[in-house]
Amino acid sequence: MRIAGLILLIMTTVCWTAPAAAGQSRLTSIANAGCIFAPIGDEPGDEKDQLKTCPGLGGAQVLVNALGTRLRIGFRWPKGPSPRKIVWVTEAWSAGTAVDWRGVNNSKGFEPYAAIIRMKFQKEDTPATGDQVLAVIRVGRGITCVMGAVDVGANRNANRLAHAFADARSSFNCGRDKPTVGGVTTAAARKIAKGIVEQ
């Protein structure tokens, strides 16, 4: 019996696999502090078309481009194979001030696989904020795309839902997998889930 028990213990030890590390959050700012501003163009009115480059995680920079009544978000990896390439992923009227990165800790430190950014739409015929949607964005070195969206007003605990959505799709393949809406589907969420097709 002791031998059988010892064999069972050895088999259990050999066959047991540690569960995957749970997703964690890290926050970075896309507010003015820590970001670099650069005007685009020299024509009258171009001061409204401004590029803001902010530090991110995983070797990424987060770029915020104000285009009059539109604002778009993009990513760039300055130490990647295409250091000057910007991949624009989502746009709306405005955006929140932080990027919520989802990832895991490994021997190299924190490795993000997703970024969550609050995108804001303008309330019709007013200068106020209307619908707000969390854009869930796949991020990897040189690769990024919208993989889903969660409407803040239509879902309770929208942040928690967006975290679970990002963690469940951490291996999302840009260009092959289709983005979806998490939780309650709304027109605003569908719009964000489409991402930006043209670069």
Whereabouts are the PLM-identified features?
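A sequence-level detector of short, solvent-exposed, charge-rich linear segments
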Residues: 15-19, 73, 181-184, 188-189
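Short helix/strand-capping turn motifs
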Residues: 88-156
